Amino acid sequence: MNDQIEFLGGRVLLVIGDITRQDVTAIVNAANSTLLGGGGVDGAIHDAGGPEILKECQQIRKTVYPKGLPAGEAVITTGGNLPAKYVIHTVGPIYGRDREREAELLAACYQNSLLLARQHGVTSIAFPSISTGAFGYPKIEAAKIASTAIRDFLGADSHIRQVRLVFFQQRDARVFREYHEF
């Protein structure tokens, strides 16, 4: 598989690589509700972005979400030491915890991140595969939900010119490529 595949006339790119190195206006962090960093993508973003991101996340926890960021919601911080100007933090659903709303919550992660991006003048954004790691969301179902949410948003919005879907492993990118709904 190539390192990059285009969808929707180049507005959506499927990329294999490191999300912390993407040259975009904003990257999305598949965060945990504490917003204090963790493993996987969350830890990598906090490590690469430096202490400024953590400081802003702590302030958000203190003033806006003292009980933690709810699943499906999104908040924005500086990009710190990252190439991206912003990091948009969103918490995906933990698979099996809320069966009635899992798909809705996962779609909301993408929708709310894109809305927040538009509000901050973001023209390019990179997403990881939200909830498919430690949160256990099935990758095929997640690919369908993510691609539908992104397609629907871009169909109604021309401000965001490029969305990158960044996968660390080729096998995950292959699943997305096979099951997307663009």
Where are these regions (language model features)?
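Macrodomain-like recognition of ADP-ribose-binding/processing modules
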Residues: 1-182
